[in-house]
């Protein structure tokens, strides 16, 4: 499974990239807003740090506007992926952009049907939102399972990015299902390191070593 970092925080991207853990980055207008910086500047800096895919989202709601924005965004760097919402206009844009060799990430996927439509339109990636489904009492991980089954059955090459990841279980379970990517907030990625037995083990090793030195 590939790990994307779901953030526009450049310092956090540098931190985790130095550990060899960042295969790509996903951003959205809300994440960019948090940084209080120019949109294009942030995307350009992220692309200079991370060599993998960097998703940048369009703001327009019509296909023509999305395509226009996409063509400006891909000028930033060759690893920019255009993030487009799951709408009819969005799929029209995805169809055109994919034929021009521009990579796309269809976002706000909440059903297997939506994922299938995006794949048929030519999306490079689809991003089903597991956490938001959990929030309304539905099973977000079940959606990942359904999408993986359908894509596997038909040999669909569109990659599945597990998005709206809220806790480590989302990562573990989607990895078991064979999802291609999890895009993870940095606070959740931090939690993947943690286990109480690891801490206990380190403490014991240090205590034993200290006792050995005092002999």
From Swiss-Prot:
EC number: 2.2.1.2
Keywords annotated in UniProt: Cytoplasm, Pentose shunt, Schiff base, Transferase
Protein name: Probable transaldolase
One GO CC term on file: cytoplasm
Pathway per the UniProt entry: Carbohydrate degradation; pentose phosphate pathway; D-glyceraldehyde 3-phosphate and beta-D-fructose 6-phosphate from D-ribose 5-phosphate and D-xylulose 5-phosphate (non-oxidative stage): step 2/3
Protein family membership: Belongs to the transaldolase family. Type 3B subfamily.
Name of the gene encoding the protein in the UniProt record: tal
Catalytic activity reported: D-sedoheptulose 7-phosphate + D-glyceraldehyde 3-phosphate = D-erythrose 4-phosphate + beta-D-fructose 6-phosphate
PANTHER family the UniProt entry points to: FRUCTOSE-6-PHOSPHATE ALDOLASE 1-RELATED, TRANSALDOLASE
Leader sequence segment: none
Matching InterPro entries: Aldolase_TIM, TAL/FSA, Transaldolase_3B, Transaldolase_3B/F6P_aldolase, Transaldolase_AS, TSA/FSA_arc/bac
Record flagged with keyword Transferase: yes
């Amino acid at each position: 499974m590939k790990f994307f970092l779901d953030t526009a925080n450049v310092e956090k991207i540098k931190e985790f990239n130095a550990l060899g853990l960042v295969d790509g980055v996903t951003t959205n207008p809300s994440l960019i807003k948090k940084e209080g910086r120019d949109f294009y500047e942030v995307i350009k800096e992220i692309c200079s740090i991370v060599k993998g895919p960097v998703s940048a989202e369009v703001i327009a709601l019509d296909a023509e506007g999305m395509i226009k924005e996409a063509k400006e965004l891909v000028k930033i760097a060759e690893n920019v992926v255009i993030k487009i919402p799951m709408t009819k206009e969005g799929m029209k844009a995805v169809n055109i952009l994919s034929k021009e060799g521009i990579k796309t990430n269809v976002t706000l996927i909440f059903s297997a049907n939506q994922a299938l439509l995006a794949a048929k339109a030519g999306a490079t990636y689809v991003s089903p939102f597991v956490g938001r489904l959990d929030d309304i009492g539905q099973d977000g991980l079940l959606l990942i399972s359904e999408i993986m089954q359908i894509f596997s059955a038909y040999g669909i090459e569109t990659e599945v990015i597990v998005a709206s990841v809220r806790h480590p279980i989302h990562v573990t379970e989607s990895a078991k299902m064979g999802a291609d990517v999890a895009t993870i907030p940095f606070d959740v990625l931090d939690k993947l390191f943690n286990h109480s037995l690891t801490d206990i083990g380190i403490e014991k090793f240090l205590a034993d070593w200290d006792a050995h030195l005092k002999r």
